């Protein structure tokens, strides 16, 4: 049996994304290791010698310096972004006005009291209307290098966001699974204007839209965004304080809307990823963060010891289905010994939307990771391997630096090498980032050598992951997976430090899971090559294969 996937081919015209200096580690055969890159080498006469860049260990040691400070030109100063963000410059002004400066030092500012207007992006908010096709909505994500886009329920005015849903890669995944007959109407949580029970007419309309999609015909985006459970569309005024947004995002909402004072117009979207970047770039301005940034994950007791995983030899389609059923956006890829091999994200679904790549759906997850890294090497001219793991002795500051640099939502926690008797993560971590954070005893900063060792483990992993056999020597893999730490955990920790309220990082995810078993749903949740999406016919059957146990 075969189904047609219908999206037209588009030209890869989106601009290349700028990467921060430590977004990826070059692991090509002709490249020096991280430690070699930071060493001094004899200069060759007649050759231009570029200025020395700070090593990765230096870059992960502390937050970037504030702008306009005397040490700005110091060789160890750095910024995780090539250009200071608008919000960072605004907060600099805000800090100077409220705290003042003296001999280059900034008087501490309470981040919780900063108005959200300081974080509003100055660039135009991208949105679409519900009359867009799923294809056009997908192209919008690709063109603007977004992970989500607001969908106005107005059929004509995409800027009218007083009532809107959102379209993201979870919706693309749902669309794909529907077409592949991996999920059906009973697996979905249909949102139809708040009705508790769908009428027969509504069910017929939904069934017709699903059948049209399977035939390769275009369907409106408002159809697909109503099929995947999401969190409430949370709005805050520009005059609300940062604490309010931090509390919401710390409870697991992926992004919130910022409106004008009258609440009549959305002026920006604040995501978890953007907020953590803002907090990192301005960390020196917020003395209340010092204790947390210098403490280890083990001491802070944040993160979860139950990461959701997929085995390396399971099919990619199984991984996509697991992300749908578990309502998560990422899976850790492990071998049979629970050694961490890699990571697969919901955004990766874009790489199988082309008919020429449909065969990857029935290939192993490990093979798909290898394909992704190969493509990234082709696009950027080098083999690359992202740093996606930490250990419990990593300081929170270095964890945040990695999250910002890799633009990730989570990092996998692996067992410390050489710490066989270290104990399980359950004794050091909690799924609740609240964990009485105020009573945590401060620990010394993690030594650079520990982090350097962790980074060197990443570098030692071959860029072509397909060449790693399941039973390979442990030295070739980061280590045994014992947990995961997310943006939600960290933002929840910051929020709980300012109040006695319970911050539950699992709140939003549990809400999505509950809504997936009902007939109603709330509406809002919280990379870069053009491809044709689901245009040609491909089979939904696959060779018989035994599913790996989890």
Curated annotation (Swiss-Prot):
Gene Ontology biological-process annotations: cellular response to glucose starvation; regulation of mitotic metaphase/anaphase transition
Ranges for domain CBS: 227-288, 302-361, 374-431, 435-502
Localization, UniProt: Cytoplasm; Nucleus
Keyword match Cell division: no
Annotated region described as Disordered, given as residue ranges: 1-78, 421-477, 504-550
Primary location: cytoplasm
CDD domains listed in its UniProt record: CBS_pair_SF
Polar residues bias locations: 1-23, 444-469
GO MF: protein serine/threonine phosphatase inhibitor activity
Compositionally biased region (Low complexity): 24-40, 421-443
S-S bonds: none
Keyword Transferase included in the entry's annotation: no
Entry's Gene Ontology cellular component terms: cytoplasm; nucleus
Record's keyword terms, sorted: CBS domain, Cytoplasm, Nucleus, Repeat
InterPro entries: AMPK_gamma/SDS23_families, CBS_dom, CBS_dom_sf, Ssd23
PROSITE patterns for the chain: CBS (PS51371)
Family: Belongs to the SDS23 family.
Role summary: Involved in DNA replication and cell separation.
Name recorded for this polypeptide: Protein SDS23
Naturally occurring in which organism (per UniProt): Debaryomyces hansenii (strain ATCC 36239 / CBS 767 / BCRC 21394 / JCM 1990 / NBRC 0083 / IGC 2968)
